[in-house]
């Protein structure tokens, strides 16, 4: 299986956007629904650009707080795996499957490289 992260818009209004996130690696695949707004999307774009331009060594983005007190959280921490252009993205996802987010979550790495 090819590693990837795919976001698909489910709906939006003037305050929020609901996204379906599918994150896949050789060891795990998760599907979860998260809520974001324009500012959170802009922050993810900014973090990725800063990382790719070499302005930061590591980027971290999350759509909210981890835990049972809110909607499902998805966080992405990205950093260089080596000097050959390989990148690791640590995916932490709370699964919105009816259980407590503190108990129904997973964390794994998605591998990619510059230019993909």
Where are these regions (language model features)?
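Charged, alpha-helix-forming regions
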Residues: 1-25, 30, 34, 39, ...
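Intrinsic, low-complexity N-terminal interaction/targeting segments
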Residues: 11-18, 75-100
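Short, well-structured hydrophobic secondary-structure segments
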Residues: 27-69
């Amino acid at each position: 299986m090819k590693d990837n992260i795919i976001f698909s818009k489910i709906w939006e209004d003037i305050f929020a956007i609901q996204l379906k996130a599918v994150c896949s690696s050789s060891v795990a695949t998760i599907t979860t629904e998260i809520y974001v707004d324009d500012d959170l999307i802009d922050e993810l774009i900014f973090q990725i650009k800063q990382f790719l331009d070499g302005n930061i060594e590591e980027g971290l983005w999350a759509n909210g707080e981890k835990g049972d007190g809110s909607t499902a959280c998805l966080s992405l921490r990205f950093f260089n795996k080596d000097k050959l252009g390989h990148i690791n993205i640590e995916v932490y996802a709370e699964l919105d499957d009816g259980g407590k987010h503190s108990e129904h979550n997973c964390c794994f790495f998605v591998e990619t490289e510059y230019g993909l």
